[in-house]
Amino acid sequence: MSYKVIVPATVLPPWLRVGENWIFARHRRTEVGVVLPANTKFRVRADFSRAGFTRPVIVRLLNNNRSTEREINLNNDQWMEVEHAHESVPFVDWLVGEKNTMAEVYFEIDGPHIPLPVYVFNTRPVEHFKSEYRQSSSGYCFLYLDLVCMLVPPASKNALLDVNIFELHQFYNEIINYYDDLCGLVEDPYADTVDSNLPNKAAFVKADAGGPGGAYYGPFWTAPASSNLGDYLRISPTNWMVIHELGHAYDFVFTVNTILIEIWNNSLCDRIQYKWMNKIKRQQLARVYENRRPQKEATIQALIDNNSPFDNWGFFERLIIFTWLYNPQRGLDTLRNINHSYRVHATRNSSIPYPQIWSWLTTSAYDNFWLYFNLVGVYPADFYVNEHNKVVHFNLHLRALALGQSVRYPIKYIITDFDLVSKNYDIKQYLESNFDLVIPEELRQTDLLADVRVVCVIDDPSQIVGEPFSVYDGNERVFESTVATDGNMYLVGVGPGVYTLRAPRGKNKRYKLHLAHSPREPVHPANDHMYLLVTYPYYNQTLTYTPYVNSDLAVDMAHLFGSNDRRYVATIYFNPFEQTVTVHLNNIRAGRENNTTLYFEMVISNPFNGQSQTFTILEDNPTLRQGYYKFDVVTYSSIRLNMSVAGRLLFRRYIFAGGTTTLTMFPNQVLEPNLFPDGSALNRTLARLREQAAFLDNYSQLMYIENELRDTIYLASQLVDPASDEFVKYYPDYFRDPHTYVYLFRFRGLGDFVLLDLQIVPLLNLATVRIANIQNGPHSYFDTLYFKVELRDTNGAIVFSYSRRGNEPMTPEHHKFEVYSGYTVELFMREPGNRLQLIVNKMLDTALPSTQNIFARITDTQLVVGDTSIEDNLVTSINVDCGDDDNQKIRVVETLKMIAF
């Protein structure tokens, strides 16, 4: 008997490659519609006359044991004769990666064969199908349940007949749809965007008595290692086997050398159990708790207290860290964002290494989880390789500061007597663990308040006394004051939580700041990033100021990558000023799992006493802990670096070959063999200086917040060229203010009410506009244009424009936008004089021309102002009746005294 099978193509989205197994990409196949008894002979061929497909057509003879199955590759249109010794069900794989094509496969079956019962969901009554299957001599049947296709083996026939197929359909489809949603995949029949899902995808389920383990997810199907489907027919929120194996379809690259194999997919499993279960079931039945939450929390507590390397934690201990990461509001957006980032990366350039996983999660989150990660012993790397194959600084903490991220931390470390059952303070939001992560805003409801003293330890209190400080929860300022005359900060009525402290950083001296609990008090998450933990009961803090003299941008560093995928492993800082070498280890696996071969070794030798210090990284390092390893180094010490793999150690801009290289620590720089100190160190510092200035340009909010990077840039610029003003805009306020001009144009209307404020700060490339709420208009006596503001870029295009007739109502607005050198400002005021004022650095400029038209051009640091059009691309008119002009001279507005704004 003859059969023809038309095989469609599986169109891949741009982020998915042929040969990759994610999201069931190679699971689709079409049944021939028969069951072949053992030793049945048949002929098969593929029709290659249809142009387009370029790969062999694959026919599979499937049953319930891989050892008795067969794969047949059809490479041409010639008939192939086949005889198979075992009962089987023939299928033809879809053509993966092809577009606008399909294959036709012909079968000629000589011997007896049995029709395969097939059910396509919702196309006929289920009972009709079950009746057909029950009466059929076939032990096999095949189900199309939308997002899952299932080859049911003889051993599961009775079980399937007892199953509610509608519930089975809902079970599988809800799992896969939810996993798709967690990863941010979007249905798209054209599959041509970075977030496109796989069109017409479906998981293929079968039995495999010869399979590994208890069950597995493979490139072509997922299966229990059994002759029957077992749990694959069990509909239950506790069916961990099924939700676990389906989760493997979404591992992507997140399990490669990350110690997250069998963790990443299970974090999705935990999320669907979180969705399915109520509060009681979540505690009793969820796999992460299993009615033993207090005991599991105690295990985590012991691991933290003992500083156990996270990579050595148990399977479910590592998993539960993701439970608490994803529990908060917007926690799941972290998962969606990191998946989107992966797809962007895979679409652009799959050869560029992915970021270290903890950095990747940190930069994908809406909240700041860095302190939480440090608590459990993982350290996000602060560097990554961008799409141009260049090592780039993340600046994780400054990025979080610029984005106004709130800091999440386990509630048990904030309210130290909190207990989910016995003392939960009647908190309204759902919490399921004493380790759930909270922010200060969520703890206001507790009405717990503290008065906290921050003791400032500084060599020169005059640098900070009387200076303002503030405490922030994300973008919200919750407290502000000034440093008291005793040199301390006093926080009054602050609730529990982790805040960001914006502390004064000195005046004409620069400091590095370190924040921690006072001595002998419970351990504070000590840090240099101003994360302030206010506990209940509360404890005082110590803020230590250490003089900052030599910029970190003058410190050379090396970047160590993994052997196979170039994952980020460590940063090595060579600091000749402090005479230290510091290794920041971010990944304890540099190569093959469980391999103890030497990967990297650093030997520091003291030339004066002959002593040496050694730091070693093996391919796998289960006894090492992520974090910082610091070594003291004297001048003229030799630093021998030994690499087992070429091209995996980057020092400055040089990629080391395999073998040994020896560096020498000189007074102001570290040099390779046969090189001597020269001016190249300044050139490297200048290059880093410009990179970090560009970072501040991208995160311009940091230009208005005192922070360590601005200190670092100031110190580096003084080292490179003290006379240059190239980086003045990035300086700390104390050094920048004398160069800063703030221009405020104030428009007034009838009754001298303020209509509009236009403020321009050329040095910061900033313009802001505040528009008042004047319902009757600026001046009801005028029915013509009363005032106008217009800014244009260097090409004459309008950047901002606003105008009103005298009787035209005004509603409140606030605008903030960037302006640059060469931009022009055109102002019109129907009644000039006192109705239009210019205030420079809070001082009224009395020399502003008293004309209806005012023109100005923005320069790097100032405004050039006049009452006539200014040459060099300035637009000459606002196109209104402006009255007479007196041809006033153009002048530069200057100020004799700087007043901070």
From Swiss-Prot:
- The Peptidase M60 domain is annotated at 27-330
Q: Which UniProt keywords apply?
A: Glycoprotein, Late protein
InterPro entries noted in UniProt: Mucin-bd (IPR004954), Peptidase_M60_dom (IPR031161)
TM spans, by residue?
Answer: none
| Residues linked to a glycan | N65, N265, N339, N349, N540, N594, N595, N642, N683, N698
Q: Which SMART domains match?
A: M60-like (SM01276)
| Purpose | Involved in disruption of the peritrophic membrane and fusion of nucleocapsids with midgut cells.
User: Any idea what this protein is called?
Assistant: Viral-enhancing factor
